[in-house]
């Protein structure tokens, strides 16, 4: 177990039983919610999911809620956002190398990358399908990290360079998270807003 700058512990999560798979499949959905807190309670009370993280309207990304039915295995399976532009479908790959290969496939196919982020819990990139629906492809880091969180990265860097960025993030004293919504620093780090 490792502690973040607030003294909270990171715990390892199960990443994937077969790390050789290019595309594991659909892993979570990010959906628009008028009131993420209220909708999260519905999914908790009716569907039995656990609320694993959230932010309120004061966060630069707006109000959000993250839920999982298996929080030890998946950091979240549903993400709810008050900002409709953050709605997406997320597909998991089995390794950082696979993420980089998939990234090159998308770029090589002439599809514009919208975002490249380190979320703490994952490395990810985003693009749109032909009808404008946002798609996320990600590789989970195996760490728990407060969400929402997005730090711009460059997926053309080597795996070693990207892992150094992850290591630097976990030791950073002034990170951006749901409990530290430093708007200026968030915007400086190329937020999704």
Model segments located where?
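Vicinal oxygen chelate
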Residues: 1-20, 26-34, 80-107, 109-193
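Generic detection of intrinsically disordered/low-complexity segments and helix-coil linkers/edges
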Residues: 4, 22, 26, 36-37, ...
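Residue-level detector of functional hotspots within protein domains
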Residues: 12-17, 22, 35, 64-66, ...
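Residue-level signal for secondary-structure boundary sites
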Residues: 75, 97-99, 145
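Core segments of cupin and vicinal oxygen chelate
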Residues: 20-24, 30-74, 191-192
């Amino acid at each position: 177990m490792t502690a973040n700058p607030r003294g909270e512990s990171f715990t390892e999560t199960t990443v994937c039983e077969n790390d050789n798979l290019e595309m594991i499949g659909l892993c979570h959905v990010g959906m628009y919610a008028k009131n993420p807190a209220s909708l999260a309670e519905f999914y908790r009370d009716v569907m039995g999911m656990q609320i694993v993280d959230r932010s309120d309207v004061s966060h630069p990304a707006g109000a959000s809620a993250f839920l999982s039915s298996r929080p030890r295995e998946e950091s979240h399976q549903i993400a709810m956002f008050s900002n409709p532009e953050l709605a997406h479908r997320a597909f998991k790959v089995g390794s950082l190398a696979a993420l980089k290969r998939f990234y090159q496939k998308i770029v090589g196919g002439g599809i514009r990358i919208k975002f490249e982020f380190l979320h703490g819990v994952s490395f990810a990139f985003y693009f749109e399908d032909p009808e404008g629906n946002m798609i996320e492809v990600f590789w989970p880091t195996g760490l728990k990290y407060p969400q929402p969180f997005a730090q711009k990265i460059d997926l053309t860097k080597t795996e070693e360079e990207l892992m150094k960025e992850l290591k630097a993030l976990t030791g950073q004293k002034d990170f951006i998270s749901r409990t530290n919504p430093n708007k200026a620093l968030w915007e400086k780090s190329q937020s999704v807003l």
